[in-house]
Design a protein with these regions (language model features):
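Beta-rich carbohydrate-recognition and catalytic domains
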Residues: 1-168, 173-221, 232-283, 297-301, ...
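Ligand-recognition surfaces built from glycine- and aromatic
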Residues: 260-264, 465-493
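Beta-strand-rich interaction surfaces with strong enrichment in secreted/lumenal proteins
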Residues: 277-280, 361-365, 424-430, 459
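Repeated scaffold domains used in trafficking and secretory/extracellular systems
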Residues: 288-290
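Secretory/extracellular carbohydrate-interaction modules
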Residues: 353-413
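Short tryptophan-centered beta-strand motifs in secreted/extracellular beta-sheet-rich domains
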Residues: 373-375, 433-450
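Short, aromatic/His-centered strand-loop micro-motif at the edge of beta-sheets
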Residues: 415-436
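Short, solvent-exposed beta-strand-to-loop segments that form ligand-recognition rims
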Residues: 453-468
Length: 493
């Protein structure tokens, strides 16, 4: 594994031609995705600034161009008309050099479309000459011409009553006429995660600190709360956030989680009253920093995209100097006291050819590199083995225990192992049993939707050349489609 110096990690991008050789090298990787957004070069992580504007979906992501390292972050810009096929527009926000408020990174944030502009709110990561970090909440404005204009001064700096871990501004409108709120992920001096609330009557000026969000029962729930958001979905308030350094049953050794709490938000008292426990958004191995779209034209359409990765983890493609992709977009609804995540109906447009299943002498079928597998599960125990060899052995296993009524995803059978410190299994109880699985398979990922979105398992996988079969056990009715590419592989900086 390459050891990066500080100078290498925080090198400024001066000319796109500096990246041509790296792009030419990584584009031939066997693990480059076909229908998922991924880093053009280097590393991508959090999705940012997800909005509907000018008849297109706009999405940005955290991008470090030089390699698979969390170094100097930029905002890279992509667009889509249907949330299925995507086009690269290139880098949008770059760090200012030397003394700028974001001189060591344009960190995560959100966006709000107003008139003919998109307002981009982000955390400016500033380092002084002694390498002490200072966080600033900054603003840029993007017009139809595609050129961003940064505001010369930040909206505000870090609040002194909290640690320097203050970032990920989420802009919220529609609470009160003519008023905007902003949520900031933060951490108390006692190292407890929290959310700070700011308010303004003007998107561009006059932001003032309202206070810390009260969430009764969650006063000491992990450390820093990253990527906070309060969404109104199906008439319910939902607090979505990423608590760090927290152990949760069924999550193996993972210490970083993405989840939500259902409840009621009172903006006057800054109190979010929970209506239950913390729920994990995605039970798989690799999902974090989920972002919901700001869509002021259709507030009832809640769409979520997340980073298909987790902090502090190395992936096999790190050796190729690239890492990271985004999940498929998911539509959010409420069922009872739970969020339901389902693949967007538009994703059916990716279906290319329905595959006739022809098991070989070992009961294994060929598994296309890009595919959708749908299974009706009629009764009893179920086992689905993906990415096996031609004998149906090894691979990633999905197993349902009908006695315990729980589903488990186990990737210990894959030949390429990584992140073993966080375990190789993830388990989720299913109160009503297993009825349905819908599985999206790309060259280096698998997304498993259980019972029409009651649970989701998202994981990176890196199958070797011999791991391109699958095998099923149980009373199942399967359908398999190949999927066509949805993201054009192109060098655009």
């Amino acid at each position: 594994m390459k050891e990066w110096t500080r100078e290498e990690k925080y090198r400024y991008l001066k000319d796109p031609q500096e990246l041509v050789g790296l792009y030419d090298r990584i584009r031939g990787s066997r693990y480059r995705q076909t229908f998922h957004n991924q880093a053009v070069t280097g590393l991508m992580n959090d999705p940012n600034g997800f909005v509907w504007f000018d008849n297109r979906w706009h999405l940005f992501y955290q991008w470090c161009p030089w390699g698979a390292v969390h170094g100097l972050k930029h905002w890279y810009h992509i667009v889509s008309k249907d949330l299925v096929t995507w086009k690269n527009l290139g880098v949008c926000l770059l760090p200012d050099q030397e003394e700028g408020y974001d001189n060591k990174g344009v960190y995560s944030g959100s966006a709000m479309p107003i008139g003919d502009k998109i307002y981009l709110y982000y955390t400016g990561n500033h380092r002084d000459p002694d390498w002490i970090r200072h966080a600033y909440t900054c603003l840029a404005r993007l017009g139809n011409d595609g050129w961003p204009e940064k505001y010369p001064l930040p909206l505000f700096g870090a609040h002194p009553d909290y640690t320097e871990n203050q970032r990920d501004p989420k802009i919220i409108c529609g609470v009160e006429e003519g008023t905007y709120y902003m949520l900031i992920g933060a951490e108390t001096k006692e190292k407890h995660g929290c959310v700070l609330v700011y308010k303004s009557e003007d998107l561009q000026h006059g932001w003032h600190f309202e206070g810390e969000l009260s969430v009764p029962g969650f006063e000491a729930f992990g450390n820093m709360w990253e990527c906070p958001s309060i969404e109104r979905i199906g008439g319910k308030d939902v607090l979505i956030f990423c608590p760090q350094h927290l152990s949760i049953p069924g999550r193996g050794g993972s210490q970083n989680h993405n989840g939500y709490i259902m409840g009621t938000m009172d903006w006057k008292t800054l109190t979010f009253t929970p209506d239950g426990q913390f729920h994990v958004l995605d039970f798989g191995f690799d999902s974090y920093a989920a972002a919901c779209a700001n869509n002021i034209e259709d507030a009832d359409k809640a769409v979520l995209i997340a980073w298909m990765g987790v902090p502090d983890v190395s992936y096999p493609t790190d050796e190729e100097d690239w890492a990271g992709c985004l999940t498929l977009p998911r539509e959010l609804t409420v069922r009872g006291r739970r969020l339901i995540q389902q693949p967007l109906p538009e994703l059916k447009k990716l279906r290319e050819e329905k595959v006739e299943l022809r098991p070989n002498e070992f009961g294994a079928c060929k598994l296309p590199e890009a595919a959708e597998l749908e299974l009706d599960c009629r009764a009893g125990h179920v086992r689905v083995h993906l990415f096996t060899d031609e004998r149906g052995e090894g691979g990633l296993e999905i197993r349902y225990n009908d006695v315990k009524r729980e589903i488990t995803v186990d990737r210990s059978g894959l030949k390429t192992q990584f992140n073993l410190q966080e375990g190789t299994e993830r388990t989720r109880p299913l109160e009503n049993g297993l009825q349905h699985l819908r599985i999206f398979i790309d060259r280096s990922s698998v997304e498993i939707f259980v019972n029409d979105g009651d649970a989701v398992f998202t994981s990176r996988v890196f199958p070797q050349e011999t791991e391109h079969h699958f095998r099923m056990e149980g009373d199942l009715f399967p359908r398999l489609w190949t999927l066509k590419p949805a993201v054009k592989e192109e060098f655009l900086i």
